[in-house]
């Protein structure tokens, strides 16, 4: 955490194809000028609640080719965020094993007991 905090003017962050398995809470909080965030082709199963809430300038985000865990209720933040910001998603984040779009996941199909 804090690794990007001093980069407050950063507009483009490419973290694709880095075998990331998790994002630290608050890792993007200071990146208010970020317009492009690339997270595709990693090993992300969910993102922390509020992970993208401070990215007020974001216009494009890439989340495809990650094994999103749509059985665990932790996915609901990302699902809701993507539904609210549909025009920003480049490609499509889909659930591991089902190819359901992450933005289409509902609370009824998830459970806290299914989280790792």
Where are these regions (language model features)?
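Canonical leucine-rich repeat
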Residues: 1-2, 7, 23-26, 31, ...
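Conserved hydrophobic beta-strand positions in leucine-rich repeat
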Residues: 10-15, 34-39, 61-63
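Intrinsic disorder
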Residues: 14, 38, 52, 68-72
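Short, amphipathic alpha-helical segments
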Residues: 38-43, 48
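Membrane-proximal C-terminal cap and juxtamembrane stalk of leucine-rich repeat ectodomains
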Residues: 60-116
